[in-house]
Amino acid sequence: MAAYSWWRQPSWMVDNKRSRMTPNLPWLLSALTLLHLTMHANGLKRGVQDLKCTTNNMRVWDCTWPAPLGVSPGTVKDICIKDRFHSCHPLETTNVKIPALSPGDHEVTINYLNGFQSKFTLNEKDVSLIPETPEILDLSADFFTSSLLLKWNDRGSALPHPSNATWEIKVLQNPRTEPVALVLLNTMLSGKDTVQHWNWTSDLPLQCATHSVSIRWHIDSPHFSGYKEWSDWSPLKNISWIRNTETNVFPQDKVVLAGSNMTICCMSPTKVLSGQIGNTLRPLIHLYGQTVAIHILNIPVSENSGTNIIFITDDDVYGTVVFAGYPPDVPQKLSCETHDLKEIICSWNPGRITGLVGPRNTEYTLFESISGKSAVFHRIEGLTNETYRLGVQMHPGQEIHNFTLTGRNPLGQAQSAVVINVTERVAPHDPTSLKVKDINSTVVTFSWYLPGNFTKINLLCQIEICKANSKKEVRNATIRGAEDSTYHVAVDKLNPYTAYTFRVRCSSKTFWKWSRWSDEKRHLTTEATPSKGPDTWREWSSDGKNLIVYWKPLPINEANGKILSYNVSCSLNEETQSVLEIFDPQHRAEIQLSKNDYIISVVARNSAGSSPPSKIASMEIPNDDITVEQAVGLGNRIFLTWRHDPNMTCDYVIKWCNSSRSEPCLLDWRKVPSNSTETVIESDQFQPGVRYNFYLYGCTNQGYQLLRSIIGYVEELAPIVAPNFTVEDTSADSILVKWDDIPVEELRGFLRGYLFYFQKGERDTPKTRSLEPHHSDIKLKNITDISQKTLRIADLQGKTSYHLVLRAYTHGGLGPEKSMFVVTKENSVGLIIAILIPVAVAVIVGVVTSILCYRKREWIKETFYPDIPNPENCKALQFQKSVCEGSNALKTLEMNPCTPNNVEVLESRSIVPKIEDTEIISPVAERPGERSEVDPENHVVVSYCPPIIEEEITNPAADEVGGASQVVYIDVQSMYQPQAKAEEEQDVDPVVVAGYKPQMRLPISPAVEDTAAEDEEGKTAGYRPQANVNTWNLVSPDSPRSTDSNNEVVSFGSPCSINSRQFLIPPKDEDSPKSNGGGWSFTNFFQNKPND
C-alpha cells in the first residue's frame, strides 16, 4: 500500500500573524511543519499495516483499520476503490464491508473529514476466510447403546461456489475439561443448506456423566486464494441422563463385540468397595461423588447366559450382564434349488459362530427381488455351525430368481446373493411306492411315485438292479415329466428264477443333483426250462461191475428254477436200456452194466420243463504209457499244463481226489475246451499239506483216455512226525543207523531229504538236550537221496557216548527231530598199545638211569654223601701248652671293661681277590666331627678294643703303630691264595704263598724275620696262627694291668681269648675264585674224572 497526506492553513491566519513575526519566526514555522508532517506520516504508515479484511462467505469482505495518529475514528468521510463502478462509499467509522473484489491488486483510498487521505493496495490473497460460527440444531442420545446423534446446518447456500468443508467435533465429559473425543469430518457444500449428522458411541455409558458437544468448521474452496482459517467453536450442547429407574449399574444387558474394551459404571448412594467381572476383581475408577467405574480389556466371548459384572457396596450388591460375541459372518455356500418346482429351498453355512443366542441370535432374511417375496429364518436353539435351510414359494411362471440373504444381530449384519434359473436347479424328492410286475421270466415292469410339478421338464432316472453274488447294474431311463405322477419303466434281460433288488433315483434332464435313492424292492422272476444239462462224469466201481454216474448241480443261472429231479438213462446202439429218476438233492446214480460201450444221458427237470441231455461214454480208452508226476500249487490253487493233442476232439476232463481215500477216488472234476493246454484248479476244499491225485483225461469220439497222472500239494508243509530210526550196528569207530519211511498223511509234502546231526554227549546233560546246526562241535550230514534208508557214521572214538538226531524236511520246512544216545564199543588194540607204551618207556628209563649211576658212582658219593672230617685230626685247635696251659696269669673267661676305639677300615687296591669288608657297628655313638673328614666310600669306621700287651718291644717302628688310638686296616687277606701262573711262581714270597697271611704284621727285626722265614718255610703244610705268638700276653687285655700298661705295641688278641679279634673263618667273597672240581651240574653227570 502507499499513502500520502498534506496540510493547508487559511490565509487569514497568516495575515493576522504576519505583523508579529520576529526574525526567528520562519525557522520556528519550518520546524513545526516538519514535525507535523513526520508524525502524520508515521500515523498513516501504521494504519496501512493494520488494515485487515475478512470474509465468511466469499461474497462480502469486512475490512477494519485503526485511525491515523491525531485523527478521530469518527472523521472518516468515505472510501474509494479505483477502477470500479460506484467506487466510493460513505463511511462514518474505520470499518467497512465491501463486495468481494476480483483477483488482483486494487487501490483503495480512505478520505477523512479533516482532509487527510489513506491509500491502500488491497488483494484477495490478503483476505482471511473465516466461516461463521456453526450452530448445533439438535443433540440426542441413545442411552441403551451409549450413542450421541448430532445435527447441524452446514449453511452451504451462503457460499457462491461448491466447496469442501472440514468439521471438527469435540466431546466433553463433565466434570472433565479435556475432550474425550476430537473428530474431523469432511463434507461437501453443495450451494444449499444441508443438515449434517454425526453419530458417536461413548466408552462410558451416557448415564454415568453429562456429555457436551461443540463444533467448528473450516472451508477449503478452490475459488478463494486468501487465507483459510477455522471458525469459532459453537456453544456447548449438553445432554444428561434423567434418572427414572432404580438401576444403579450401566449399561444393562449390553451386547458388545468380543475382544473389545468397555467401561461399566455404578451410581451408588453409598461407597462402592469393589467391582469384578465374573470372578476377577478390577480396579475402581472414581468419576465423581460415589460414582465409580471399571474398565474391561479384551472381553472374551460370553457363555450362553452372558458375563456377570458385580459392584459391592457397604450394604448392597449391584450388577449387570454383558453379552460378548461377533457380528454375523458372510453367509457361505449359498445355494438355492427346488425339489418339486413349487418351492425354492436355499441353504447356506452361517460361517463363524457369533456366540450370541436367544433374542441376540442372528436373524436371516431371504429376499427375492423380482417377485418381492421374502422369508425370515431365526435360529435360537444353539451355537452349532450347521447348514441352514429356508424355503420361499415360487411365483407361477417365473424361472429366474434373484435372492439376497441378510444376516443381522445386535453387532451388525452381512449379506450374500445368488441368481438362479430354477428349472436348472431341480433335485427331486425321493421316489416312493415302488412296484415290480412280471411280464415273463426275463422282463418286469418297475414303477414308482414322484411328487412335484415336472410338466415342463424331462426326468432322467437311474434304476439299480442287483442280484446275489453279482455286480450291481445301473440302467438310465428318460421320462417325460408330469405333476405328482407314477412313472413306469420296463426292465428286461433278467435271469429266470432269480432274486433281484430294485431301487431308483431321478434328476432333471439338464441335471443338477440326483435325488436320494429310494428304498429297495425285492423281486423273484418266474422259472424257465434249464438252459443246459448237468456237468456229468462216471467211474467204474472197484469190482468193475457197476458204473457210477456223477453230476453237478446246475448253477442258478442255468437251472432257471428249482430242480425237482434228474432222469438218468443208458443206451446201447441208440437204444435206451434203462431210465432212472433221481430226486434232488442226490447227484449220483449207480447202474449195473456190462463192458459194452454205453452212452449215459442225464437230464435235469424243473416246473417249467427239462434241460438238454448231458451225454458221456461208459468206456475208457486204455493208456499204458503213464508216469506219475509231481506238482506244487500256491494257496488254494494248482496250475496244470499239458501238450495239445489233435486227437482230442471233445474236451479235457481233470479229475482230482484225496490220495489217502480208497478207490473209486473222486473229489471233483472240471471240463475245459479241447483247444486248451493249461488250467488252474481252484477249490475251497483244497487244504495245505494234503496230497491230491490229479488225472487228465482227453475226450475222443470213442471215449475218454487217461493222459497224465499227477500227485501234488496246493501248499507244502513241514512233516509232523520224525523218522523212526534205529541203530543196526555199533563198533569202536562207527555207528550204523537205519530209519523207516514217513506216512504220506504225516509227511505233508514231497520229501526232499534228511538232516542227521551227531556230537559227543551224555544223556540228560544241558549241552545235549537239543542240537543246533550252528554249533561248531556238531557234525551235520544232509541226505538228499530219499531212497537211502541207512547211514554209517565213521571216524568215531571208542567207548564214547554220542547224541544222534534225525529230521526229515520238505519245501515246507523241517520236521520234528528224533534223537538217540549211543555208546561206541571199546577199542582192544588201542588199549593194549596204551598199556605197552608206558611199560616200555619205564623200562628204558630205568636201564639208562642205572648205567649212568654206575659210571658216576664216585661223583654221586662225593656230591650227596661227602666224608665228614674228624675234629680230632684238626690242628687248628692245637695250641702251645706253654701258652694256654699252666699259667695263672691267663684269665680266659674273665670279663673286664673294654673301652672301644674307633677303627677306620680303608679299602686298599689289591691285585688279588679280597674278602669283602665287614662293617662292625660299635655300641658307642660315632662323633660327627671326626666322621666328616673321612670319605665314606673308601673306609668304614668301626669300634675296636685293643688288647693290652705287657711285653715291650724295642723296635722303634712299633711306636708309631702301637701308640695310635686309631687302628687302620689296610687289607684283610683271605686264607686262600689265588692260583698263580707257572711263570709267576718264582717271584712269589715262599712264606706268603705257603700258608695263611695274618691280618696284621707286627714289626720285627730283620734277623728275627729271616729266622722266622726259615722256620715257616718248613711248616707250610700246617696251620699258621693269625698273629705272632711271641707277642701274646698272658694276661687278659681287659685286666687292670693291661689297661695301665705303657707298652704301645699290642696284639689283636689270642685265639684262646674270648676277646680275640682274629678272623678264624673267612667270610664269603664273591670275587674269590671258585673250585672247578666239585659241586653239582648236569654236564658233570655225563663226564668222567681222571681217576674214574
From Swiss-Prot:
Gene3D superfamilies in the record: Immunoglobulins
PROSITE patterns: FN3 (PS50853), HEMATOPO_REC_L_F2 (PS01353)
Positions annotated as glycosylated: 164, 199, 238, 261, 385, 402, 421, 440, 453, 476, 567, 647, 658, 675, 724, 782
Extent of motif Box 1 motif: 864-872
GO cellular component: extracellular region; plasma membrane; receptor complex
Signal sequence, renumbered to the chain: 1-43
Tissue: Placenta, liver, kidney, heart, lung, brain, and embryos. The liver may be the primary site of synthesis of the secreted form.
Transmembrane segments: 829-853
Residues with the Phosphoserine modification: 922, 1039
Membrane side Cytoplasmic: residue ranges: 854-1092
PANTHER family registered for this protein in UniProt: CYTOKINE RECEPTOR, LEUKEMIA INHIBITORY FACTOR RECEPTOR
Compositional bias ranges of the Polar residues kind: 1027-1062, 1081-1092
Family: Belongs to the type I cytokine receptor family. Type 2 subfamily.
InterPro entries, per database record: FN3_dom, FN3_sf, Hematopoietin_rcpt_Gp130_CS, Ig-like_fold, LIF-R-like_Ig-like, LIFR_D2, LIFR_N, Type-I_Cytokine_Rcpt
Official protein name in the record: Leukemia inhibitory factor receptor
An MF annotation (GO) of this entry: growth factor binding
Disulfide bond entries: 53-63, 80-88, 208-265, 336-346, 461-506
Biological process, per Gene Ontology: cytokine-mediated signaling pathway; positive regulation of cell population proliferation
Record motif WSXWS motif, residues: 514-518
Stretches assigned to the Extracellular side: 44-828
Function statement: Signal-transducing molecule. May have a common pathway with IL6ST. The soluble form inhibits the biological activity of LIF by blocking its binding to receptors on target cells.
Domain Fibronectin type-III: 45-126, 330-429, 430-529, 533-624, 622-714, 719-828
Key words, A-Z: Cell membrane, Disulfide bond, Glycoprotein, Membrane, Phosphoprotein, Receptor, Repeat, Secreted, Signal, Transmembrane, Transmembrane helix
Subunit: Heterodimer composed of LIFR and IL6ST. The heterodimer formed by LIFR and IL6ST interacts with the complex formed by CNTF and CNTFR.
